[in-house]
């Protein structure tokens, strides 16, 4: 799999995808966030012609799951951010397709540390690219404009920014904006769930119905809110492929 580059990740991720065309043609998306029985649904909206919007919807399921919206017939990916202690957590990443096995190209990209997966140091859960080696940033690739960040793979690009904030951030110095709406809504839900748990109430997101959801991407009339899309595109249907364009 060594020959499978991180560029291949983008190839299989978006190849033949109508959603990719919408993504590239509208670089100023709008965010909408609504509460769900088990957490939040985070919608990103782009123009899809004169009458429709192209939606990519990420479910955040209490207390630590996210599922990334798909492109075309490509796999679904997700994360579980599981605390270890007050300053560290495991970031478990999973990939699957509801109606078929993953193919060799998809598996090769993942083994090579592409897409949302990373290569690990043997015998550990620590990524090969990490803070101690500056995430193996490739300055020459940046100079040649082959890579904006110089860091290989979406997962490590994200991790490099997340870890740069330190283990515990000073919330009083944050400057959240409307595109951060999901952040403060999720914090509020976790805060409220903790208080209610202390009163003996069961936290949301633990029942089967709340967990039986998928991410989705779809076109929808501009007149219809994404959380009212016909056919419930985020509902799990066993053996049936996810809703994606």
Outline where the language-model segments fall.
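Peripheral, non-cofactor segments flanking catalytic/redox cores
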Residues: 44-245
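A generic structural micro-environment signature
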Residues: 10, 39-40, 87-90
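Single conserved hydrophobic/aromatic residue that forms the stacking wall/gate
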Residues: 1-8, 12
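Polyanion-binding catalytic cores of nucleic-acid enzymes and NTP/SAM-utilizing transferases
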Residues: 13-58
């Amino acid at each position: 799999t060594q020959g499978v580059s991180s560029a291949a990740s983008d190839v299989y991720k978006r190849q033949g995808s109508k959603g990719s065309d919408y993504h590239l043609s509208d670089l100023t998306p709008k965010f909408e966030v609504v509460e769900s029985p088990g957490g939040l649904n985070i919608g990103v909206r782009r123009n899809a012609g004169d009458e429709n919007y192209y939606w990519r919807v990420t479910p955040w399921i209490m207390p630590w799951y996210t599922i990334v919206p798909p492109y075309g017939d490509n796999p679904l990916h997700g994360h579980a951010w599981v605390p270890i202690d007050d300053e560290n957590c495991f970031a478990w990443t999973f990939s699957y397709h509801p109606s078929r096995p993953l193919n060799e190209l998809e598996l090769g990209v993942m083994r090579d540390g592409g897409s949302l997966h990373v290569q690990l140091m043997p015998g550990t859960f620590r990524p090969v690219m990490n803070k101690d080696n500056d995430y193996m940033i490739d300055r020459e690739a940046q100079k040649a404009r082959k890579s904006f960040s110089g860091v290989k793979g979406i997962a490590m690009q994200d991790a490099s920014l997340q870890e740069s904030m330190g283990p515990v951030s000073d919330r009083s110095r944050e400057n959240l904006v409307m595109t951060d709406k999901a952040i403060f809504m999720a914090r509020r839900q976790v805060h409220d769930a903790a208080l209610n748990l202390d009163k003996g109430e069961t936290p949301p997101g633990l029942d089967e119905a709340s967990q039986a959801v998928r991410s989705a991407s779809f076109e929808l009339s501009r007149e219809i809110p994404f959380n009212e899309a016909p056919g419930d595109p985020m509902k799990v249907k066993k053996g049936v492929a996810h809703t994606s364009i």
